Amino acid sequence: MVVIALWGCETDSSDIDKKVREVASAFAEAYFNYDFEEALKWVTDDSEKWLRFAATNISQEDVDSLNAQMKAATVEIGEVSYIDDNTLTVGITVEDFLLKDTLGKPGHIEDEAEYNLTVVKQGKKYLVRMACLPQNERRSHD
């Protein structure tokens, strides 16, 4: 009887992990390819302001760089960590994307960067919660 109960919990955890990975992937693919309308579908209501902020800081030079890019940004989902019952952190690696790291200056194509996304449970859905724009985790450790 105990084995069945443990197996049931593992399945629930596995299902949650899968859902969280899907949400993080959908958000990151949209966000790092500058499809903010699509990214908006995968974030909490209070995160919308950060997507709007990012969208209003794109210059014509950035648009030209995005249009000249030969391939879309790619995202690899890494480790999922539980913070509490309703909050998780998802590590992602993003490749070949336009990095905007200084306001008022054009972005540049970045080969690879690592980010952590916070995913929260709201009702029956999991959504990305942005407290700020995503920050490159590698850069902060240099």
Please report, for each region that a protein language model flagged, where it lies by residue.
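Short solvent-exposed beta->alpha transition segments
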Residues: 21, 36-98
